[in-house]
Regions:
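Solvent-exposed hydroxyl-ligand-binding patches built from regularly spaced Ser/Thr
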Residues: 23, 78-80, 93
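Envelope-exposed proteins and targeting segments
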Residues: 33, 38, 52-54, 111, ...
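Short coil/turn connectors at secondary-structure junctions
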Residues: 32, 76-78, 136-139
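Extracellular/periplasmic ectodomains of large secreted or surface enzymes and adhesion receptors
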Residues: 1-39, 73
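Divalent-metal coordination cores built from histidine and acidic residues
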Residues: 83-89, 95, 99, 103-150
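Histidine-rich, glycine-flanked metal-binding segment
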Residues: 47-89
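Solvent-exposed loop/turn tips at the surfaces of repeat/solenoid architectures
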Residues: 39-40, 61
């Protein structure tokens, strides 16, 4: 088996990459137009309160307007989502992480959309760039510093 180890690892890595890419392509969405979330119970982080009956409009992956239900003009052709009073929170940050390819979907499932990697190995930034593409699901990663290679 030792003679085959390198080939086996390469095949395992290739299979895992294909699985991650298939998962990302099946679950990732990039809306072409505006997205409107209506009737949300919005968490206001500046006032530390919930704002019931709130509409939030997103365009090009950014929040472009927030207001009470019925107070904002809805862009033509926008995808509309009825939050039905459910809570709407901003994406959460985890400021002390050591992410890897397998942890990406777990962060997102927990509402964590951005992380800071506290001690990246020299090859880790390139490895985790797949989160910015459709190759793997994961949060935005900010690197605090990189461990110097020897």
């Amino acid at each position: 088996w030792q003679v085959s180890l390198t080939a086996m690892r390469a095949e395992q890595d290739a299979q895992e990459a294909r699985r991650r890419t298939a998962q990302a392509q099946a679950l990732r969405r990039s809306p072409s137009g505006a997205v409107v979330i209506e009737h949300a119970n919005l968490f206001d982080s500046e006032r530390m309160t919930m704002r019931p009956g709130t509409t939030v409009i997103f365009a090009q992956q950014r929040v472009v307007a927030v207001g009470p239900d019925g107070s904002l003009p809805i862009p033509a052709g926008a995808e509309r989502i009825d939050a039905a009073g459910r809570a709407l929170l901003p994406g959460l940050w985890d400021l002390h992480t050591h992410p890897d390819l397998d942890s990406g979907p777990l962060f997102l499932a927990a509402g964590v959309t951005s992380v800071r990697d506290m001690a990246a190995e020299p090859d880790k930034p390139a490895l985790l760039r797949v989160f910015d593409t459709s190759e793997a699901l994961g949060p935005r990663v900010v690197f605090a510093f990189s461990i110097a290679s020897s």
